[in-house]
Amino acid sequence: MEMQFPVILDGATGTELQKRGFTGDMSAEQWVLEHPESILEIQRKYVASGSNVLYAPTFGGNRQKLEERGIFNRTEEMNKALAQLSKQAADGKVWVAGDIAPTGRFLAPLGDASFEELVDIYTEQAAGLEQAGVDLYVIETMMTLTDARAAVLAIRSMSKKPILVSFTCDESGKILSGTDVVAALSVMEGMGVSAFGLNCSAGPEQMLLQLQRLHKYARVPLIAKPNAGMPEIVNGEAVYNCPPEEFVALVPEMLKAGVALFGGCCGTTEEHIAALKAALKDAEYVRPAPECLDLLPAATEKEAFFLPADATHGAVLTADGDLEDKLSDAMDDEWPMVALKLASWADVDALADYQYMIRKPLCLICDDTELLEAGLRAYQGRALYEGNLTEDALAPLVEKYGLLV
């Protein structure tokens, strides 16, 4: 599939379901299956108003979230059925995106999840969406880089369809786990996503500031799916007061910031989508022109680093012995990056356990493709490589993990 930019996404699902009787007493996914006419009405209105892409109502459809609601062993079945409802609403006129959202789980030291557990959770959900025949995938409202990476790997294990990724961040550009959105951009671009951006958390004005930051570094089209302003709590309920004409007032500035996909999150309606369609009439998308194409876009889990090709590291660390102390010392030395040798599976485990200490770009030293891939899979950033492996051996790892060589 080839999108002609700018593309109009859909608007809110959750707040629209609430208008139709959803109270939150059960899983939204279960409620939609019991009230299919609600999502069909919502999404048909979005199509009529100008949406080119519908998000399947599978936001909370991963196994973790379903089990928290007492729903077991139905992940694939429910995701397939929910996505088929969106296919019905689309009626072949627009694309349907399988919607994947946070698990709410964290890796150590913040939580007890393993990365492979997250991949497994998302793989089950993606399988149901793929069976339904979705046209693309959207990974949205991401609050940790680990969830986003796991979701991309899960999707790529069964599909080559386009993947859109959007995070939610605070006014400083940090997501819940402390990752800067520029670091998330670097990692996601390296993993081959088709577009990157922001959704939820803010209205258009606040979101624009972070999109302008991203524009300086983005090599892919950007996504803007803001709320209808910041909510006010009225009688215990969140009320969004940004009218359609105000919602689209900054569309010209967003286009200048490289935004190619526009939509609405919480509080937006078909009227906001219609306003977007009008605002984007005859608009021309200008692809981002990053300022740092000659630099290497490395990243830790938290921060982005743009390095010259001749950047160097100090002594190569080995994972045997006390890696914790070695990393602590390396973070305080004068070298711009840290190098770690992977010579065994125990080394990969050590990297996974102590990567939270890494605050510099990481260069992996390894001559075994299986070990190197395991290290790249475990490392929640974007690493550089040094070693004797051939370009042909490295090519799949560059494509899959964004390895910098």
What are these regions (language model features)?
Residues 1-405:
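Domain-level signal for soluble alpha/beta catalytic cores
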